Amino acid sequence: MTDQMRDMIAQLMGSQHVDNKEKPSMPFDHHSVCRAFLLGVCPHDMVPDSRLQNVVSCRKVHEPAHKADYERAQKEKDHFYDVDAFEIIEHAVHLVDIEIAKVREKLEDDVKTQTSQAADSKAKQVAEIEEKIAKNVDDIEKLGNEGKIEESMKLHKYVEELREKIQEIEDSQTEVKTAGPGSNSAKLRVCEDCGAQLNITDHESRIADHYNGKMHIGMVETRETYLKMKETIDERRKEREEKLGSQRGYQRRESYGRRDRGGDRGEYRGDRDRDRRNRDRSRSRDRSYRRDDRGDRRYDRDNRDRRDRDRRY
């Protein structure tokens, strides 16, 4: 039997129908069992084989047999495991949002760095061109003074071309300064659902592969589950607290009742012991009185015998 088939049987039938060698070492309600897994919404399982599994890692036990045991027990009474599962999902969404913020910040820093480097490079280009323009302007004046009009006009045209080049560089620099993440200068943007970096210049099919991937779909479903559970979480927490409070009150009353019953029995046993001791002391005194009475009668009889003998003599 393959591991997959074994897991399917365990998930359907529960731990009672699993071989002893493969039976979980703890019950489904043990604190080490993942309660989000029991409800089928553990974030770690929602993003399989992706980098987000390290972000939303889960160290609790995931046993298919536990899930079947829980579903069977849940029909008997409400365990309120959705409250614990919500807290797990909420924490996972928070961690992913932190990861997304880090990626976005990195992209923005990269754009700023690239913008600064590009600006420095273009400033250097402009300085070199302006130096050429200054030199050629001096040459134009010299040629004009010498009457070389045709050569002067050629240099003048060249200087105008250099000035147009400077304008093009300055215009492109303005575009870079106003650019941000997601623009043509950055090319990359971050997916707001799962934090993946997307290149907007990629082919549509490649971008579609991302949106259809396990990591993206898993995080979208996790966020949807989180928002849905958030609508009723306050009410569910209140219900659980009321139930736990009722159970604690019942347990206290039972504890007090056992102590009271134990006290009554103790008093009853104490009374019986005291009665028994009193009876023993009474019997002991009676025996002592009888012994003393017999001794007195024997003494009186001996005295009478001695008096009778004395008279005869």
UniProtKB/Swiss-Prot annotation:
InterPro entries: Luc7-rel. Residues 237-313 are annotated as: Disordered. GO terms for biological process: mRNA splice site recognition. GO terms for cellular component: U1 snRNP; U2-type prespliceosome. One of its GO terms (molecular function) is mRNA binding. Belongs to the Luc7 family. This is LUC7-related splicing factor homolog. The lineage of its organism: Eukaryota, Metazoa, Ecdysozoa, Nematoda, Chromadorea.
